Amino acid sequence: MADNIILECTECGDRSYLSKKNKRKHPERLSLKKYCPVERRATLHRETK
């Protein structure tokens, strides 16, 4: 059962990515390095609540 999650930039707070994750298999928060259009560079994006 995959749920939609929102990824938020840790530096500017922009929420520009949507992803899916199985919360039963991976209960910890997801962190990915992705491109931030506001910062115009790759930054760390974390799963929001």
Swiss-Prot record:
The keyword Ribonucleoprotein applies. It comes from the Bacteria. One of its GO terms (molecular function) is structural constituent of ribosome. Keywords: Ribonucleoprotein, Ribosomal protein. The keyword Ribonucleoprotein applies. Disulfide bonds: none annotated. Transmembrane segments: none annotated. PROSITE patterns: RIBOSOMAL_L33. GO terms for biological process: translation. It holds the Pfam family Ribosomal_L33. InterPro entries: Ribosomal_bL33 (IPR001705), Ribosomal_bL33_CS (IPR018264), Ribosomal_bL33_sf (IPR038584), Ribosomal_zn-bd (IPR011332). GO terms for cellular component: cytoplasm; ribonucleoprotein complex; ribosome. NCBIfam families: PRK00504.1 (NF001764), PRK00595.1 (NF001860), rpmG_bact (TIGR01023). HAMAP family: Ribosomal_bL33. Belongs to the bacterial ribosomal protein bL33 family. This is Large ribosomal subunit protein bL33.
